[in-house]
């Protein structure tokens, strides 16, 4: 579809993911062992025949830029007939500073959709995990002669307040939109996927609209205004879609991949999820090892250890006698001999010392520093951290990036505590 331009919003910080997104943009967070979250939006584009793709970055873009590069893994390294471009905030005569919101990001990059005579512009969130063919949505949008079409999915009523929700009339047109309401009137959640007529989008941002708010955010400003002034439709998507914006939802979405028939099938030959992969040897499981219901990426070595219901990214080494259970361990981390890692998320290049125990005990006290993010028993270990041998670390513990052995004040880290190299913490 050469008449559709795609803009992927990938500049979000994702604060609710705690230290997982402290040193990288949320779309660059690893997922499912070998992938990153942005891989799903990019793969959906090329699998849908959409090759004109712009990725709008902002917060800590280095790892995301490095991952996407020229777009070769997604067949987006094209000089003609499409290709991927990465657009970052820039200083110019009429623009300054960072993007203030999703709509502001698109406004500052309108030049991208004027390069060719596109008919429509597809705007995607780059921080969701899903497998979606965009072609039926585009077809419905054009058949209904809609100005804007919003992809929606029903969610549990108890979760609806986490999303922007739409209210639809009997004739199928949207009559109201509420951004993360305390008392939602609908459970039809916006997926952060918007399909605009290009000319309407250009008119919206380049002409005066005296009765309009300042267009900073699509959910808060643009969509409510267009509901009053344009034809806004919905496209209901019933396939797999997950907002992995919290530590718990991120962990659950990864663990769901281990089911016999997961809703997100990474093995579907008709809908491949592409990624940038390093050249690494196959995973190796040595004598005496036990691996049950787990995903092991290339370069992993399990040396007579036990891995249960866990996901290991490339290059992870689990030493003899160690146990990894219900956990996510990212690239090139080493689990020392005899160590136990239970219900943890371990970032890249972490070293867990021999006989250390992470996820120790039954105390589920929330983390004192981030109680709203770490309260379900998951312990987080930041990138490049070194955990000393023999230490006991409870649940809902936050081990910051770059922590060294000398940053640990004792042999026991109680549940709900934090170890951070920036501050000295004294526990009673």
From Swiss-Prot:
The entry describes its oligomerization and partners as: Homotetramer.
Q: Which reaction does it catalyse?
A: alpha-D-glucose 1-phosphate + ATP + H(+) = ADP-alpha-D-glucose + diphosphate
**Can you tell me which residues the record assigns to a coiled coil?**
none
Which residues does alpha-D-glucose 1-phosphate bind?
A: 99, 164, 179-180, 190
- Enzyme class, broadest EC rank: transferase
> Is-annotated flag, keyword DNA-binding?
no
UniProt keywords (A-Z) are: ATP-binding, Carbohydrate metabolism, Glycogen biosynthesis, Glycogen metabolism, Nucleotide-binding, Nucleotidyltransferase, Transferase
- The entry's protein name is Glucose-1-phosphate adenylyltransferase
**InterPro entries this protein is in?**
ADP-Glc_PPase, ADP_Glu_pyroP_CS, GlgC_bac, GlmU/GlgC-like_hexapep, NTP_transferase_dom, Nucleotide-diphossugar_trans, Trimer_LpxA-like_sf
Gene Ontology terms describing biological process: glycogen biosynthetic process
- Example of a GO MF term: glucose-1-phosphate adenylyltransferase activity
Native species of this protein? Thermomicrobium roseum (strain ATCC 27502 / DSM 5159 / P-2)
Pathway membership: Glycan biosynthesis; glycogen biosynthesis
What EC designation does it have?
2.7.7.27
Family classification: Belongs to the bacterial/plant glucose-1-phosphate adenylyltransferase family.
Give the lineage: Bacteria, Pseudomonadati, Thermomicrobiota, Thermomicrobia, Thermomicrobiales
Q: What is the role of this chain?
A: Involved in the biosynthesis of ADP-glucose, a building block required for the elongation reactions to produce glycogen. Catalyzes the reaction between ATP and alpha-D-glucose 1-phosphate (G1P) to produce pyrophosphate and ADP-Glc.
């Amino acid at each position: 579809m050469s008449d559709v331009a795609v803009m992927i919003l990938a500049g979000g910080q994702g604060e609710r993911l705690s230290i997982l997104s402290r040193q990288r943009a949320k779309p660059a967070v690893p997922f499912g062992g070998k992938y990153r979250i942005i891989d799903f939006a990019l793969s959906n584009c090329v699998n849908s025949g959409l090759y004109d793709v712009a990725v709008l970055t902002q917060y800590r873009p280095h790892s995301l830029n490095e991952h996407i590069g020229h777009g070769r893994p997604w067949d987006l390294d094209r000089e003609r007939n499409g290709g991927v471009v990465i657009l970052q905030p820039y200083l110019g005569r009429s623009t300054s500073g960072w993007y203030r919101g999703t709509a502001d990001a698109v406004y500052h990059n309108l030049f991208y959709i004027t390069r060719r005579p596109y008919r429509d512009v597809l705007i995607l969130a780059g921080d969701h995990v899903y497998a979606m063919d965009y072609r039926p949505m585009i077809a419905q949008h054009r058949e209904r002669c809609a100005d804007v079409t919003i992809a929606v999915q029903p969610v549990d009523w108890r979760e609806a307040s986490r999303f922007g929700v739409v209210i639809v009339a009997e004739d199928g047109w949207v009559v109201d939109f509420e951004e993360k309401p305390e008392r939602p009137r609908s459970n039809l959640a916006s997926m952060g996927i918007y399909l605009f007529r290009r000319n309407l989008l250009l008119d919206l941002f380049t002409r005066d609209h005296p009765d309009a708010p300042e267009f900073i955010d699509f959910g808060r400003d643009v969509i409510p205004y267009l509901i009053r002034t344009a034809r806004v439709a919905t496209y209901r998507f019933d396939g797999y879609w997950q907002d992995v914006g919290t530590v718990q939802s991120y962990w659950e979405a990864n663990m769901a991949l281990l089911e016999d028939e997961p809703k997100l099938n990474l093995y579907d030959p008709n809908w491949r999820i592409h990624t940038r992969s390093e050249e690494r040897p196959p995973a190796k499981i040595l004598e005496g090892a036990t691996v049950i219901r787990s995903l092991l990426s290339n370069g992993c070595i399990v040396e007579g250890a036990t891995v249960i219901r866990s996901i290991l990214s490339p290059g992870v080494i689990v030493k003899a006698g160690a146990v990894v259970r219900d956990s996510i361990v990212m690239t090139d981390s080493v689990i020392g001999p005899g160590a136990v890692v239970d219900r943890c998320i371990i970032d890249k290049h972490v070293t867990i010392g021999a006989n250390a125990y992470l996820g120790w005990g039954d105390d589920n006290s929330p983390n004192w520093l981030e109680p709203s993010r770490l309260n379900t028993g998951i312990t987080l270990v930041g990138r490049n951290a070194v955990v000393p041998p023999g230490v006991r670390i409870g649940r809902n513990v936050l081990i910051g990036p770059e922590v060294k052995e000398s940053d640990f004040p004792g042999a026991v880290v109680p549940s709900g505590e934090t170890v951070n190299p920036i501050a000295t913490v004294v526990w009673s």
